[in-house]
């Protein structure tokens, strides 16, 4: 029916006429009235519907451009009260009149920001818009700019109806610069449908400015060197070319365009400068021969660090010095670097690699957003829920790790302020939040140092799984300190000399060594050096070692290394089901309110998933993966039954969806394959697991596994006397009694089970284990290539093999 709800009328306003024609329409649908609004910039006029909604109870009018208070609850005191800007009122298809609102967000709903960042009664614009029901309108509100708000006195009479707007934000935590809301609202009235686009432009412009500042810190210096080099080289050939640096310093109004041009023009500038440099070399070969000791060549050239470099010729011309290729960025003074190099290699040449440009930001063109008319609101909500439940999602806080956060923060804050070295060992099973907590601590320490609350420091992260070899850690650390790339052997000597030298200006260095058990070598010299350097009084080195087991220092490391590691050990225990529930709930609270009404994960479903995971491992990643998979299953059901669902009601993710997701993880193809293996293959895997736990090493030789199988089998089976015609499992696997007829009462047992080579080959081909390719069979190293939890969970359900674990 084309009728408005009871208590509501509407009026069509004609802007061209200076009068308002009001009609009480409850029957026949009127013709649409559209007016042309001339834009201030002289562009073509924009056509929009001028519909004014009237609430007959209090004769309150609502039109495009009004800021309103809206709720889906009982009234203004309801916690679901929100604020929005009406950007579109039109005749619709599903509803007689449809209203589109762009949303504000309260400053109190944003966590993780300083208390003095927001003003009282401040709202923030968001780029989110949705359709609402006008019967939920409460009242209009006053939204003022910063200058207007300063002239208003806020008291109890207007504290719920007068607000300040000077910033915009999005769901990624980005904020815009302070703007004048009065000017912004005037632009919105010209074309209200593009309000969300204008808000996105405000935020993106601010983000690009921040990236431009970081980009310009290094890029402008490099370009300045290139410009001076080009100008000086061309003087040799008497060429006068003006080099413009305007592209390096873009105006505020042209930030987006000039960034792209700046990046794209780098290669052409470099090529032009190289050609000018080659011409200068031909004309000034005599000068180059005099300056051979101070010029730095390209990537394959050699730089001589010797004591002779201190005796430089002061009369060398500036032209030839500038003609050299700009050297990579160094974090230390050039003289200090030369002193260290001269001590390590006083008469040798060392090759320095060219500094890479991986750290430079990449400017990508933004993707075009799909119009809201072609997207399903619930599909968008499902997408955001899955995004928030992803393990890589950045969080404002880490629930359940407050105590561990405080312990790590206190240790490192005291070490940085006192400028002393120390080692901290952090252990816990995978998925316990070790790395995330440490990164959160470093981020908070960085914020405190920027505000002057603690000393400045530098930070480096090393992951043992990402290093090609353990000695690469030396190269990465020296490159972080000096900017030079040298070999591992030279880097170790340079680092030893660097940390021994006393330098009062040196900042403390914090190193996170994640998966540090992967850098263990036979001599363990890499671990020894990294734990020995913090003991120097002049090092100012703080090492955070992260591994998975508590007793790893005693089991793997020698006494001299374990003693240097110290007694500062922080253990991350498994999450309880309450903590897992808090983690999932915290992520769901980050979803925008509009999408939060479309898709809901019930509290029973969250509790069921939390208890299931907490009873097994307490792994937060596993709990999030199960919930994310449950949302995917619920989304599939929604798309299949989309026609029969009521879009006004939220779609619920139930316990049944969680149970289906858990069954998929338990009954994975890998688990089914391991469960279907014969007993002999399971015995090989069980012996490999048992040997790995005994030695603490992931790789073990086949000879050790054969001995482990034989010993564990002898301990698990009984030794009662049996008749000559009876067979037991040991006879089947180890003796020839099964395949040959013998009269011996006690059969001779083989050293290995039958078809052992074929069993190992089949496991390798299936991808269950990895075997080293070496001539000696018993000395070949074997390693499990699948998650250990998968194998253990399957074997625990098998009564025949569980006793061998």
UniProtKB/Swiss-Prot annotation:
Please state which protein family the record places this protein in: Belongs to the ORC1 family.
Task: Decide whether keyword Plastid is in the record.
Answer: no
Where is the sequence biased in composition, kind Basic and acidic residues? 239-259
- The BAH domain covers 60-180
Where in the sequence does UniProt note compositional bias of the Acidic residues kind? Answer: 271-303
Q: Where in the cell is it found?
A: Nucleus
Name the predominant localization: nucleus
Which UniProt keywords are listed? Answer: ATP-binding, DNA replication, DNA-binding, Magnesium, Metal-binding, Nucleotide-binding, Nucleus
Q: Which GO terms describe its molecular function?
A: ATP binding; ATP hydrolysis activity; chromatin binding; DNA replication origin binding; metal ion binding
**What's the source species for this entry?**
Candida albicans
Q: What GO cellular-component annotations does this UniProt entry give?
A: nuclear origin of replication recognition complex
Question: Which gene is the coding source of this polypeptide chain?
Answer: ORC1
Write the protein's name. Answer: Origin recognition complex subunit 1
Which residues lie in Basic residues bias regions? 308-321
Record CDD domains: AAA, BAH_Orc1p_Yeast
What GO biological process, any one, is recorded here? Answer: DNA replication initiation
């Amino acid at each position: 029916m084309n009728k408005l709800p009871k208590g509501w009328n509407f009026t069509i306003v004609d802007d061209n006429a200076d009068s308002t024609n009001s009609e009480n329409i409850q029957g026949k649908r009127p013709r649409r009235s559209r007016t042309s609004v001339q834009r201030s910039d002289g562009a073509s006029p924009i056509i929009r519907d001028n519909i004014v909604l009237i609430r007959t109870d209090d004769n309150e009018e609502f039109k495009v451009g009004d800021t309103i208070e809206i709720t889906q609850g009982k009234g203004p005191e309801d916690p679901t009260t929100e604020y929005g800007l009406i950007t579109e009122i039109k005749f619709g298809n599903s509803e007689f009149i449809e209203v589109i609102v762009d949303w504000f967000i309260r400053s109190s709903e944003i966590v993780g920001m300083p208390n003095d960042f927001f003003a009282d009664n401040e709202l923030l614009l968001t780029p989110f818009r949705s359709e609402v029901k006008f019967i939920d309108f409460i009242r209009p509100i006053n939204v003022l700019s910063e200058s207007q708000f300063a002239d208003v006195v806020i008291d109890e009479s207007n504290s719920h109806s007068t607000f300040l707007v000077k910033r915009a934000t999005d769901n990624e935590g980005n904020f815009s610069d302070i703007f004048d809301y009065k000017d912004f609202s005037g632009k919105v009235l010209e074309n209200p449908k593009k309000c969300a686009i204008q808000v996105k432009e405000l935020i993106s412009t601010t983000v690009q400015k921040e990236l431009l500042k970081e980009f310009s810190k290094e890029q402008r210096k490099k370009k300045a060197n290139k410009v001076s080099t080009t100008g000086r080289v061309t003087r040799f050939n008497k060429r006068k070319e003006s080099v413009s640096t305007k592209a390096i310093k873009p105006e505020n109004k042209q930030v987006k365009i000039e960034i792209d041009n700046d990046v794209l023009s780098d290669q052409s500038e470099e090529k032009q400068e190289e050609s000018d440099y080659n011409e200068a070399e031909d004309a000034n070969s005599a000068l180059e021969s005099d300056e051979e000791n101070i010029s730095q060549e390209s990537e394959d050239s050699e730089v001589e660090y010797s004591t002779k470099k201190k005796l430089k010729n002061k009369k060398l011309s500036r032209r030839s010095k500038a003609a050299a290729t700009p050297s990579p960025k160094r974090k230390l003074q050039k003289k200090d670097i030369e002193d260290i190099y001269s001590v390590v290699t006083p008469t040798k040449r060392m090759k320095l690699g060219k500094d890479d440009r991986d750290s430079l930001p990449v400017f990508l063109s933004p993707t075009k957003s799909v119009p809201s008319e072609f997207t399903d609101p619930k599909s968008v909500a499902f997408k955001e829920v899955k995004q928030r439940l992803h393990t890589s999602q950045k969080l404002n806080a880490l629930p359940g790790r407050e105590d561990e956060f405080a312990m790590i923060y206190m240790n490192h804050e005291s070490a940085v302020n006192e400028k002393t070295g120390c080692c901290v060992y952090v252990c816990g099973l995978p998925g316990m939040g070790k790395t995330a907590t440490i990164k959160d601590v470093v981020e908070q320490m960085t914020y405190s140092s920027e505000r002057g609350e603690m000393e400045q420091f530098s930070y480096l992260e090393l992951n043992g799984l990402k290093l090609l070899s353990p000695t690469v850690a030396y190269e990465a650390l020296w490159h972080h300190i000096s900017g030079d790339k040298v070999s591992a052997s030279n880097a170790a000597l340079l680092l030893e000399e660097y940390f021994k030298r006393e330098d009062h200006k040196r900042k403390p260095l914090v190193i996170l060594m994640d998966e540090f058990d992967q850098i263990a070598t036979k001599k363990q010299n890499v671990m020894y050096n990294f734990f020995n350097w913090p003991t120097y009084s002049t090092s100012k080195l703080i090492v955070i070692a992260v591994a998975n087991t508590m007793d790893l220092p005693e089991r793997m490391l020698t006494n001299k290394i374990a003693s240097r590691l110290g007694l500062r050990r922080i253990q991350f225990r498994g999450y309880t089901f309450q903590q897992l529930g808090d983690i999932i709930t915290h992520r769901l609270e980050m979803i925008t309110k509009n999408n939060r009404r479309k898709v809901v994960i019930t509290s029973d479903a969250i509790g069921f998933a939390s208890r299931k995971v907490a009873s097994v491992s307490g792994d937060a990643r596993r709990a999030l993966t199960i919930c994310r998979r449950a949302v995917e299953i619920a989304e599939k059901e929604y798309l299949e039954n989309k026609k029969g669902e009521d879009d006004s009601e939220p779609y619920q993710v139930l316990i049944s969806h969680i149970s289906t997701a858990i069954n998929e993880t338990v009954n994975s193809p890998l688990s089914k394959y391991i469960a279907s293996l014969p007993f002999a293959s399971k015995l090989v895997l069980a012996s490999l697991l048992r040997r790995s736990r005994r030695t603490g090493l992931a790789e073990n030789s086949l000879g050790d596994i054969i001995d482990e199988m034989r010993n564990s089998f002898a301990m698990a089976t009984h030794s009662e006397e049996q008749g000559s015609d009876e067979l037991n499992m040991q006879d089947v696997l180890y003796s020839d009694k099964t395949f040959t007829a013998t009269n011996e009462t006690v059969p001779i047992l083989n050293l290995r089970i039958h078809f052992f080579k074929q069993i190992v080959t089949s496991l390798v081909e299936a991808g269950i284990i990895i075997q080293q390719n070496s001539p000696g069979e018993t000395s070949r190293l074997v390693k499990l290539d699948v998650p250990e939890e998968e194998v253990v969970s399957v074997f625990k359900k098998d009564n025949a093999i569980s006793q061998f674990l």
